[in-house]
């Protein structure tokens, strides 16, 4: 298994090291290539993501990312557009996959959360994030700006099909989230596509929520959800809310996936680079380790993905919430548990 590793910035390299520790406990065939991408490189030489970097990434089976960002050192949007979004579009990561699970021993901010175990399938290469827009008369009283949301049948359908396949392997329930009563063109395309694809999956029940209703249900009744499929912007909102109700983004993993397998998919913890705790050895690597499990599942190694997830569940359940986290100790415990 050839892995490209982007440790990135802040605590990124620390948590990625622990994810690799767990992977190597299970697999002896892992070959890694470290790539220097992120704020440190940008501040050093102004480079973000070159054609050579992309060519090297394409030689690998998957990409493991730590964290990107240097708040206060790099202007907002530079790393997001020049590195992260460029990676997503260049490698056609059209599926953003975000599981949300409340583990035993983890406190939710919800008073009575019930069972939280669902997945958000977010379209990753279209919608409002394509950069299709502009502004005129900037800085004047007549300034006008627009951001065009681009939705194609091709782009929506491939993500919707991925979501149906996922739902079929889980509890067989899919929820489309959009705003079809106002966004009648883009929303209509999504609704029609879901309705048509649903005929091929008669075992999967389907319902629909407006985005505003979905944000309410995530707080009042999260157990109603199994697989949520939605567009880029709404998915961005829902996935952060989903992380918050299930114990925080410190436990949240994600995948940026080319479902065709043409390009390597990328897996990462949701949390940021947290430069304030960099080098202190107190960053929680759990999300990075769960990202590694997602990667194994994507590559067809279901058995080892389950081993990691079960080891994480036991480890989280046994933690003292008042005790400080040790990055390497968490990695050591989970690496030992997956082979016990």
UniProtKB/Swiss-Prot annotation:
State one Pfam family annotation: Iso_dh
Residues given in the record as substrate binding sites: 88, 98, 122, 212
The record's annotation in PROSITE patterns points to: IDH_IMDH (PS00470)
Instruction: Give the keywords, sorted.
Output: Amino-acid biosynthesis, Branched-chain amino acid biosynthesis, Cytoplasm, Leucine biosynthesis, Magnesium, Manganese, Metal-binding, NAD, Oxidoreductase
One GO biological process this protein is involved in is: L-leucine biosynthetic process
| Cofactor descriptive note | Binds 1 Mg(2+) or Mn(2+) ion per subunit.
Residues engaged in binding NAD(+): 272-284
Subcellular location(s) of the protein: Cytoplasm
The superkingdom listed in its UniProt entry is Bacteria
Q: What does it catalyze?
A: (2R,3S)-3-isopropylmalate + NAD(+) = 4-methyl-2-oxopentanoate + CO2 + NADH
The record's listing under InterPro entries reads:
ICDH/IPMDH, IsoCit/isopropylmalate_DH_CS, IsoPropMal-DH-like_dom, LeuB_actb
Record's GO cellular component terms: cytoplasm
Q: In which pathway does it act?
A: Amino-acid biosynthesis; L-leucine biosynthesis; L-leucine from 3-methyl-2-oxobutanoate: step 3/4
Needs which cofactor? Answer: Mg(2+); Mn(2+)
Site residues by UniProt (Important for catalysis) = 129, 179
Which molecular-function annotation in GO is an example for this chain?
3-isopropylmalate dehydrogenase activity
The EC number(s) given in the record are 1.1.1.85
Binding annotation for Mg(2+)? 212, 236, 240
Disulphide-bonded residues = none
| Subunit structure, as described in the record | Homodimer.
Similarity-based family? Belongs to the isocitrate and isopropylmalate dehydrogenases family. LeuB type 2 subfamily.
Q: What does this protein do?
A: Catalyzes the oxidation of 3-carboxy-2-hydroxy-4-methylpentanoate (3-isopropylmalate) to 3-carboxy-4-methyl-2-oxopentanoate. The product decarboxylates to 4-methyl-2 oxopentanoate.
NCBIfam families assigned = PRK03437.1
- In Swiss-Prot or TrEMBL terms, this protein is called 3-isopropylmalate dehydrogenase
